From Swiss-Prot:
Keywords: Hydrolase. This is (R)-2-haloacid dehalogenase. Pfam families: DehI (PF10778). The lineage of its organism: Bacteria, Pseudomonadati, Pseudomonadota, Gammaproteobacteria, Pseudomonadales. One of its GO terms (molecular function) is (R)-2-haloacid dehalogenase activity. Gene3D superfamilies: AhpD-like. Homotetramer. It catalyses: an (R)-2-haloacid + H2O = a (2S)-2-hydroxycarboxylate + a halide anion + H(+). Belongs to the HAD-like hydrolase superfamily. S-2-haloalkanoic acid dehalogenase family. Catalyzes the hydrolytic dehalogenation of small (R)-2-haloalkanoic acids to yield the corresponding (S)-2-hydroxyalkanoic acids. Transmembrane segments: none annotated. Signal peptide: none annotated.
Length: 301
């Protein structure tokens, strides 16, 4: 990728988040929340509820209303296309910016079977497909709270309102290795990922790939040198900009402002907390999109 001279300035600073993050995982969701989770997964066509969603779900009155307002756009051809555009752009950015070596032969040398390599690729496909959707949703929540604007609702192309493909994969939930179950080398890899990416926890993507610990160690080792480069930071800026642009073109108007959050039942303090939490998650997702792309390009060679 030919970067402009000022590409080093195209960075997304990490938001300050002093709030305690309290995700509500699927196995702890009550009936009402489980129904929302199922609808979200079916709408996105994915088998997992992202930690970003689980964290916002802690603020239940807000989350339920935000999803109700966003879901009509998420069920459309436009949303599918906008998410796919981000995924494809991520593929272009990583492929043009970095020399990514294939890992397939190395995995075979390590004893991985054809079946296991296929399973790794299938898991990467799930997150590669779903992460852009979570990014756009998180961007809508964040920008709505911060700006108070109404996004979208003026689609000129009737095709944008067409329903998305009914094909989806909502089961089974990918097997994930939680941090408290990680020992030895995997625990060290988790710690390195969190420190390098400035994460307060390990994302679902890495926990799913940790099902194959030696694979994750190898894949992360190949990605890590890219993280602090101007090309990577400019790529995050680009992905974030595309998510922002998608908001203005949402087929159905979305608005969930700070005042709306208060009217939904949150207190001022809870709303301040929520803004910090969603700002951090939205920031993380632009990098996560690129990282999974890098992993996938490694695995396909």
């Amino acid at each position: 990728m030919n970067l402009p001279d000022n590409s080093i300035h195209l960075q997304l600073p990490r938001p300050v988040c002093e709030a305690i993050i309290r995700p509500v995982p699927e196995h702890r969701a009550d009936q009402e929340l489980s129904e929302i989770y199922r609808d979200l997964k079916a709408t996105f066509g994915v088998p997992w509820v992202g930690v970003i969603t689980q964290a916002v779900a802690y603020y239940r009155p807000f989350f339920a209303e935000a999803w109700r307002r966003f879901a009509p756009s998420a069920k459309t051809h436009f949303f599918e296309r906008a998410s796919d555009d981000i995924r494809i752009r991520s593929w272009e950015l990583m492929g043009q910016s970095f020399v990514i070596e294939g890992q397939t032969d190395r995995l075979r040398e390590m004893g991985y079977s054809v079946r296991e390599i296929g399973q790794i690729r299938a898991v990467l496909d799930i997150f590669d497909y779903g992460n852009p959707k979570y990014l756009i949703f998180a961007t809508a929540i964040k920008e709505g709270l911060l700006s108070g604007r109404t996004f979208g609702g003026a689609a000129g192309d009737a095709r944008c309102h067409f329903p998305r493909s009914p094909i989806c994969q909502i089961d089974p939930i990918p097997v994930m290795v939680e941090e408290h179950h990680a020992g030895g080398t995997l625990s060290q890899v988790y710690a390195d990922i969190k420190q390098t990416l400035q994460l307060p926890f390990i994302n679902s993507d890495y926990k799913a790939m940790a099902r194959w610990p030696s694979y994750l160690e190898q894949a992360w080792g190949a990605l890590k040198p890219c993280i602090d480069t101007p090309a990577y930071q400019a790529g995050r800026f680009d992905i974030n900009a595309r998510a922002l642009a998608a908001l203005d073109a949402l087929p159905t108007a979305y608005r969930m402002s700070r005042d709306d959050a208060l009217q939904a039942g949150l207190s001022e303090a809870q709303t301040d907390e929520l803004i910090q939490v969603i700002s951090l998650f939205q920031w993380m997702l632009s990098g996560l999109v690129l990282n999974v792309t890098h992993f996938k390009q490694q695995a396909l060679k």
